[in-house]
Every structure is written in structure tokens, then in C-alpha cells.
Amino acid sequence: MKKFLITGGSGFIGTNFINLISKKNIKILNIDKISKISTLEKYKKILKKKNYTFKKYNLSDKNKTYKIINSFKPDAIINFAAESHVDRSISDPIYFISNNINSSTNIFFAYKEYYKKKKIKLYHISTDEVYGSKKKGSSVENDKYDPSSPYSASKASTDLIAKAFNRTYNTEIKIL
């Protein structure tokens, strides 16, 4: 049975992703600190599934994050973890920037250490917000980053840190 470690899986997108994969033969560990917008109530059925485990945890400690990864031994890591409310990021930018950048960097660091033992991929979930507002058409991956809020700037920063980890440490962080 494959094992997926999911960070931030209690938000809107993470919940829907877990709903989808929980029907497959995949063992799931969801790590989430449960913020104000988390949707844990929306998947009470999943909580009862034998292939699903939830662990309430704040990703602020890179060493503890590594211990969780190392003990679970995932085949893939999917990082949804981020505070994502644009308006709240405008009223409290320091919290958003600090939380999103530090949490993702801690995940990348822990992944880098685990990657030395087992070559797995980490899928870092980004947002179209990193490209800013388009007057016409939609954004594509090669577009220039043009964040328009502290939230989107924090996500753009984590994307760039992921790219730097790949270049510096030869890891396989995929930005989606």
C-alpha cells in the first residue's frame, strides 16, 4: 500500500484531495494545525476510514517535522499547508508571511533530509495568485510572478525556495 503524507490537508483544496484519494488503496497521514478556515468537519466520514490518520501539528519545528516524515515513511509528500485568506493577509501580513514561508521551508528541509534515505517526490501546491491579476487570458507556468497581496507574495516566496532546494540539494520538489 502506498503512503502519502499530506500537510495542510484540512483546508478546502486539501479536503477535496483527501476525499478523492481516500477511496484508493493509499495510506494517508494528514498533518494540519487546524486554522480558522480548516474544514475538518466536512470530512467526518474520512476520519473513520482505516487508511486515514489525522495528526494535529504546527509545522514550525523542522526537526519534529522530519521525525514525523521519517517514522511514517511516505512514498510521496503533498504540501497544501498555508494560510490562504487574502483579506486577512492584508490586515496581518507578518503572520501570513512568517507562517507560510517558515512552514514550507521546514517541510522542504525535513523532506531534503528524508530524501537522502528514500528518493520520493514532494508536491508543493502553489496558487494562481502568484501571477497577479490578468486583464486577458489566464496565466501559464512561465509567466513572471507578480503577487498582489501578502498571501500571494508568501506563496511566490515558497515556490522560489522550493526551486532553490531543487538546485542546491538536488531534490525533487514539484510545484503545482
Briefly describe each language-model feature range.
Residues M1-L176:
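N-terminal Rossmann-like NAD(P)+-binding domain of SDR-like oxidoreductases, especially those catalyzing
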